Amino acid sequence: GLEGRQPLLPAEGSALGAVNLAAHLTKGGRLDYKRLARTIHTAVHLLDNAIDVSEYADSRQSRLTRATRRIGIGMMGLAEVLRAKGVSYDSEKARKTAQQLAKVIDEQARLASQRLAGRRGPFPLFTESRQNNGAQRRNSAVTATAPNEVLAAICGVTPGISADCAVSAQACVKMQAAVQRYTEGNVYLPIPAKTREQMQELCTMGYLLGCKSIEADVCEPVEIPDFLKDCQPERETQEIAPEKPQSALRQEMPHFCPACGRALRKRQIVPVCEECGPLMCLQTVENMQ
């Protein structure tokens, strides 16, 4: 994940996932914490494996991601848990419930990462990190709540810690702050802010409560000033050289193999080098036609 749920180094990546809380509800509406702990340990193992088997954009991203081994386990289906308990989303009891769940996820994820480090070793940059004075961990970070709308839709639950009904923006910020206390990375929760002024107030509120980020769900469009509308980049006048006929281009451009330097010969459409074989270069094909 590169969307900012985990603070990352340049070109670094992380593996993110979410635990379906609703799947751990018993028939009586209670949470099965033992089963939840097993799920978290499995998730840590899964995401750590994902770091090794994933394909990356380049060698630098692959090297940095495997050096820190950041993962982010979050939650989804919180609204279903609160509804099963008969608790209103905008209540102190709901925030305490969410905070307790975040604490369990964080503690079990740390424990699972420590056990995994005992078998596989800590992340390569452990001795250079701020965690080198504590217990060895397989992953430099273990918890974060990312936007998991797709996963939630597959599981049939509400995404992340979102409510299943309309609630105030202040209630969302308070809920996010409650979960953020026991989350290493960021906690994603879209805030229904309608104006820029309201968004500024919510950002201040979130900062004072300990949130690491505040993201607006809906905000009024900002009018573009006239001086920006009329601003156009100056175009430099350049003289365009007359195009040369195709026959002249064919005579000027020698057709040699870029690998061994031998002359190319054309076989049907694909140019062929006697030493290296066919060359699938479209530009070379077009020039030889």
What are these language model-derived features?
Residues 1-289:
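Long, C-terminal-biased catalytic regions of enzyme "large/alpha" subunits
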